[in-house]
């Protein structure tokens, strides 16, 4: 049985990257809350 997590940089960026977060209202809300919390890394 193969593992479920098969890393891909492109897929990671497209699903969880900064530009993808900025493209939706809720994504911007995620970034805002992470800024508020003081996260060093905002997105993948």
UniProtKB/Swiss-Prot annotation:
Residues 1-44 are annotated as: Disordered. Keywords: Ribonucleoprotein, Ribosomal protein. It comes from Streptococcus uberis (strain ATCC BAA-854 / 0140J). It holds the Pfam family Ribosomal_L34. It comes from the Bacteria. InterPro entries: Ribosomal_bL34 (IPR000271), Ribosomal_bL34_CS (IPR020939). This is Large ribosomal subunit protein bL34. One of its GO terms (biological process) is translation. GO terms for cellular component: ribonucleoprotein complex; ribosome. HAMAP family: Ribosomal_bL34.
């Amino acid at each position: 049985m193969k593992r479920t997590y098969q890393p891909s940089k492109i897929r990671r960026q497209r699903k969880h990257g900064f530009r993808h977060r900025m493209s939706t209202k809720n994504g911007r809300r995620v970034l805002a809350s992470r800024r508020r919390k003081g996260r060093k890394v905002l997105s993948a």
